[in-house]
């Protein structure tokens, strides 16, 4: 329908995808649907996982929770750091476009590889103690939203949504705590976050 609408189609990301060319040809319908599905599912799944991860992390750390209530300007850095420690997206698959060496391992062009973002964001050579929460880390080292040509196109929106959710949650509560006797149940790979999380909010 959008292609048929021509110049009457709304000027949005989907319409721009329909005009996008790769190697001199327009993307076909299957490619456009795949991209839009990845954007949508990636957004919904990772945002919901992220909110659970953030709430759980703060429920376990009342001092940090209170600090962020009193200094909401710290939230953007705190959110990125918490999600570096507990990644909402564990891994992604890629196909190498050229031969590359990673560590001492040779990988030929055209190989299928799995990138473990959660592991990269806990690399001791970059982050020292990867479990230590620090607001002064170099944000360019954090691969929460990927990097290069595969950087998440929704990163600015995701950051905005997470900041607003946490601002509102902290502004309208004075305590977020775990429910005694109801331990959280972690999601099963390839998902992240929690499949069940009980919190008491006052």
Where are these regions (language model features)?
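Cytochrome P450
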Residues: 1-202
């Amino acid at each position: 329908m959008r292609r048929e609408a021509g110049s009457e189609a709304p000027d949005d990301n989907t319409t721009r995808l329909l005009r996008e060319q790769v190697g001199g040809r327009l993307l076909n319908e299957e490619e456009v649907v795949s991209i839009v599905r990845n954007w949508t599912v990636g957004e919904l799944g990772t945002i919901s996982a992220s909110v659970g991860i953030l709430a759980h992390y703060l429920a376990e750390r009342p001092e940090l929770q209170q600090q962020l209530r009193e200094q909401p300007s710290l939230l953007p850095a705190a959110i990125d750091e918490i999600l570096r420690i507990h990644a909402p997206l564990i891994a992604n698959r890629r196909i190498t476009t050229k031969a590359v060496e990673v560590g001492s391992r040779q990988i030929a062009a055209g190989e299928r590889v799995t990138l473990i973002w959660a592991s990269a964001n806990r690399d001791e050579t970059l982050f020292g103690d990867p479990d230590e929460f620090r607001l002064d880390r170099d944000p360019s080292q954090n691969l929460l939203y990927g990097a290069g040509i595969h950087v998440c196109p929704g990163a600015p929106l995701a950051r905005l949504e997470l900041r607003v959710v946490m601002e509102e949650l902290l502004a309208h509560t004075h305590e977020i705590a775990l429910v005694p006797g109801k331990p959280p149940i972690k999601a099963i790979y390839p998902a992240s976050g929690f499949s069940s999380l009980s919190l008491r909010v006052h």
